[in-house]
Amino acid sequence: MSPNDTRLAGRTALVTGSTGGLGAAFATALAEQGAFVVVSGRDIARGLAVLDRISSTGATAAFVRADLSRGAAEVHRLAEEATTAAGGRIDVLVNNAAMLLAPAPTANVLEQQVTDAFAVNVVAPFLLTGIVAPRMAKRGHGSIVNIGSINGLIGMGGSALYSATKATIHSLTKSWADEYGPRGVRVNTVAPGPSLTERNADIAEQLAPLLARIPSRRASTLTEVAAAVVFLASDDASGINGATLSVDGGWSAI
């Protein structure tokens, strides 16, 4: 870290679903700004790789394995183990873990798929916030950044289920901002548009027709989306609560 990378010095952060892709970028960016980050996800090897990446920047972090599809007990375990790993408190919570869903007609989606998608994308962050936010409120400060999506902001045929889960996250942000804001806890959403990660880099050419519809004519970078998360987590955004910050190249504006 450079001497100027201290916006989050002395803070602790938990980033769910941070063993790869956007989540790993969020964890790394928060650590680079001085936060002690708890990385979390299902894959131990990938989690340790993210720790190595963070360590290479001169920052420190810990890893807590968690599979948020396993229900309330797993969410509670993550909250307690992450709090312990972070030295007794979590100052920043990034609700990033999500089940990505392939486009499909609504009529082809099975009931179990609906249950599974909402379990990870909605129920898990709902329960985790219900544990972490009151503790933040008791201390009088904290920042929660929910990761939404362009899918939760606009209509997108073939993506009804995923869009519904993300629209729910956007709604929860507003409710939680009102619930916890008076006690010093800010809750905001970052809503990414198309972004290239190691998981979808192989379909970059297939995204070309989609990107042609976006004012910026390109996908967002991981760094750009992570910068939005860092901003909302930091005191630079102290006056922002209940907002959705879109990082989509202007797609949601048209």
Description of each model-found segment:
Residues A107, P182, T189-I214, E224, ...:
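A glycine/serine/threonine-rich, flexible loop-to-helix segment
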Residues T129, T165, T173:
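Active-site helix of classical SDR
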Residues T12, T19-G20, D43:
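Conserved glycine-rich cofactor-binding loop
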Residues F126, R218-A253:
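C-terminal substrate-recognition "lid" of short-chain dehydrogenase/reductases
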Residues A104-T106, L110-F118, I144, N200, ...:
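Substrate-binding pocket helix/loop in short-chain dehydrogenase/reductase
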Residues S149:
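Residue(s) in the substrate-gating loop at a strand-loop-helix junction
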Residues P134, D178-P182, S238:
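Alpha-helical segment proximal to the catalytic Tyr-Lys
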